[in-house]
Amino acid sequence: MHKIIGPGKIKDTLHVMHLFVIECDKRDELQRFLKEEGIGTAIHYPMAIHQQPAYKGRIRGSNELYWTENLYKRILSLPMYPELSDNEVERVCSALEKLFNDLSHRI
């Protein structure tokens, strides 16, 4: 869980940032930790798109998409909304920093 990957940037585009989705190998542990810190998170995509009923039979080729299936198990949405104050952003960042500091002392 020592590594979190944030949203990427694509040249010459702007992101609306309605979701702030990160990747983490130990997503469920991270989510539990943040909940204990009073920080809500969400798993907006509990299954890969090609596995959802609405897309059944609509995907050409193999119905197994390794990278997609691997990724959806690792993504977690952190708080992101217009009313989120700078103090709340700082609280989320501090909780993540606390987690990484705790982990680094255990190694």
How would you name each of these model-derived features?
Residues 1-107:
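PLP-dependent aminotransferase class I/II
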